[in-house]
Amino acid sequence: MKIAILSRNSKLYSTRRLIEAGRKRGHTVRILDPLRCYMRIAADGFSLHYKGKPITGFDAVIPRIGASVTRYATAVLRQLEFMGTYTPNPSDAILRSRDKLRAHQLLAAQGIDMPVTVFGDNPDDTQDLLSMLGPPPHVVKLNEGAQGAGVILTEKASASRGVVEALRGLYANFIVQEFIGEAEGADLRCFVVGDKVVAAMRRQAAEGDFRSNLHLGGTAAVTEATEQEQEVAVRSARALGLTVAGVDLIRSKRGPLVLEVNSTPGLEGVEGVCGVDVAAAIVQHLEQSVRRSAG
């Protein structure tokens, strides 16, 4: 196969591992910086160009799209989709995952449990809005934040109101969620490829923080996801239209709750902690999917 990887940096761990895995299995792999791609759209057809030359002949494209370039990079990916290139994570699915409110609405529509989430705009409704969550602590999240950025824990009702009012003053879109205390700052990252969880790790927040992201000082250890947790993770990815995803769950008294579905999950943490060749699993999934679509 001829595989394209949409990535701004070929030296990033995840990008390097996907290149290695693809070439090891005999495929031609090329890195495309999405911001260097440009396109022609007309009724007589679609074309994509890169550094002065047309891009043609790719069987599959793996999107590694950072949050800061979401809009442009998904437009490039969509162009490749219209040109008949297979992708495990379509452009519309990535856009769903990057909008926390929309993602939670789609998950809830499939009966997938999550922390209770509220969203509202008018300041006159703030008190009633927050009352739907019960007493604090509350978790306020920017709607398009990533990697733990823009996530605030408020421990008093006055703090919740203050943060909500401040974000409205900045015209920021945000959601507010109930805080699940029994999770004790830990979550479960399930790495979904196709219709199964290929690796899982338990992440623990650093002392004094409640966010378990590894780059914020959290720690991780390999763990075994239960059958229920694996089912929830796969259903969550499917609900957004993704076949490669990092699904973050917390273990609660009412079962696994979905925090987020990441459409561009990093490989370094999960491969290093779990000792699983996730990159190879992704490439094998591409092979199977392209064969099915061709047949």
Curated annotation (Swiss-Prot):
Residues 104-287 form the ATP-grasp domain. It comes from the Bacteria. Mg(2+) 1 binds at residues 248, 260. Its EC number is 6.3.2.-. Mn(2+) 2 binds at residues 260, 262. Its cofactor is Mg(2+); Mn(2+). The keyword Manganese applies. This is Probable alpha-L-glutamate ligase. It comes from Xanthomonas euvesicatoria pv. vesicatoria (strain 85-10). The lineage of its organism: Bacteria, Pseudomonadati, Pseudomonadota, Gammaproteobacteria, Lysobacterales. The gene is rimK.
